[in-house]
Amino acid sequence: MPNNQYPEFVPVEPNWNQNTVAVQAGRPARFAGAPMNTPVTLSSTYVHTTDLGYGRDGNQSWGALEEVLGQLEGGIATTFSSGLAAATAIADLIVSGGTLLVPTDAYYGVKNIFARLEMHKRLNVRLIDLENTDSTIAALKGADAIWMESIANPTLVVADIPAIVNEAKKLNILTIVDSTFATPLRQRPLDFGADIVLQSVTKFLGGHSDILLGAVICKSNAHAEFMLKHRHDFGAIPGGLDAFLALRGLRTLAVRLDRSETNALEL
């Protein structure tokens, strides 16, 4: 969502569908001579008149991308240098020594992160069969957070997110959904009550195999502020050109998804 680090954007109308939001959100406010696209910002430092003073604090290109992702997911987006950098930021949110439930078929890079954190006694990791909703719900007791990946990469397992989130909330468990394969045009986990969504922008959102980017979309302001602080402190920032290219990819996301689904059904 917009903040005082970035210029104003074209307002998103309540009656726009998701396809229109993907095309129109994040464009600069319109005035005579204004560009239709947010220009690429390549700068390490800024004039100290706002919170945007140094390159780790923000970038106008990120801001436009975060505006689109936040609008599409229904939350507050923070972008990172890769999907795994975004996953690491989420892991940092979990209390030290806390128990994290992770699907057995989660993306290998994510499992590597959690294995390393467990090795250093930062987290306790318990593996779950996310496809089995009953056993997943039974495993919630004693956990601090649950990581769901739906649709899973590459097994294509689909989780019953609403049912699992509903039970997790009763136990005050942090709920995280990697929704990369679904994209926000096919699934919005925050609408199901999840706390946090991960998107590897590298994949469908970027769509052209020419960038590495990740994003964390949070429902609460507190979690969003934590992500901003983590990015500033750890420095896993996206490049301005990468953000620009991701925006370009988002503009065609709807038609690319439609064609992919048509081709899959034909096959």
Predicted regions and their residues:
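Conserved PLP-enzyme active-site core in the AAT-like
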Residues: P2-P14, Q24, P28-F31, A77-L267
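N-terminal "arm"/small-domain region of PLP-dependent enzymes with the aminotransferase-like
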Residues: P2-S61, L65-V68
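Glycine-rich loop-to-alpha-helix module at the N-terminal edge of alpha/beta enzyme cores
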Residues: A64, V68-L72, T78, A85-A86
